[in-house]
């Protein structure tokens, strides 16, 4: 066993290295130091690195992204070089601001654009032709091609999860998984997307997200969705395809919304939505009146009908007469 490990790995002061002559397919490697992947790893294999206080954990598996050589000089033959600030890999056609940080273990593909003060953490893959605005922080994340990430976005940070132990102390739950973002996704400024705890947080292809949106851990969002500003989606919620959420819509945790649902602004989803259609209110209910603008109750709906039927000049005259009569002495 020891001899086979020596043929597979070599150890130096810089970490644990996979020998170039080795043709083994490594599935899981647990190491206490950084692991550098050499050129003999098969193509279309990605690295998922989970760091802890005790040791680093690296899992290798198939993915849509190429695993790139991360030797000290980069992989010049494939057009990839090592970024001087952080040691991450980037394609020579990518445009990266000099103040950006690309950590070791991150990969930036061709024609990507990274703005000023961008921080790309380890275990991150930036797809082709992705545009990332200034002051953005991304880690533990896989971003597809042709995505647009606006200023100040945070992707891949810890999710919000705590529990009380036997001693009454508040203990943080481990948040060790990743965020997966599809192709042609646009994310507005100052939006936050948490990484998963028991499953990856996923955003489907062609989904568009406005500014100041919060997406919790373990959330799964389908393709071609539209989220307006200040939407909040709690952890472990599931949203189907072609779903539109108006401004300040709130979705509680562990609920499911089917495809082709539209939610009016300021609505709150407290239970599963199983039928396509238009919803609104608190809690959200399905719109049944064709002319109603999600009236809060029947009286408000009837008053709206009366106001539509009365001419505006007559309505104003009645208001003035009522004000005059109220001022008259008895």
From Swiss-Prot:
Residues 1-52 form a transit peptide. PROSITE patterns: HEXAPEP_TRANSFERASES. The keyword Lipid metabolism applies. The record marks 9 as: Participates in a stacking interaction with the uracil ring of UDP-GlcNAc. Pfam families: Hexapep. GO terms for cellular component: membrane; mitochondrion. It catalyses: a UDP-3-O-[(3R)-3-hydroxyacyl]-alpha-D-glucosamine + a (3R)-hydroxyacyl-[ACP] = a UDP-2-N,3-O-bis[(3R)-3-hydroxyacyl]-alpha-D-glucosamine + holo-[ACP] + H(+). Its main location: mitochondrion. Hexadecanoate binds at residues 210, 214. It comes from the Eukaryota. GO terms for molecular function: N-acyltransferase activity; UDP-3-O-(R-3-hydroxymyristoyl)-glucosamine N-acyltransferase activity. Disruption phenotype: No visible phenotype under normal growth conditions, but plants lacking LPXD1 accumulate very low levels of 2,3-diacylglucosamine-1-phosphate. Its EC number is 2.3.1.191. Homotrimer. Involved in the biosynthesis of lipid A, a phosphorylated glycolipid that in bacteria anchors the lipopolysaccharide to the outer membrane of the cell. Lipid A-like molecules in plants may serve as structural components of the outer membranes of mitochondria and/or chloroplasts, or may be involved in signal transduction or plant defense responses. This is Probable UDP-3-O-acylglucosamine N-acyltransferase 1, mitochondrial. It comes from Arabidopsis thaliana. The lineage of its organism: Eukaryota, Viridiplantae, Streptophyta, Embryophyta, Tracheophyta.
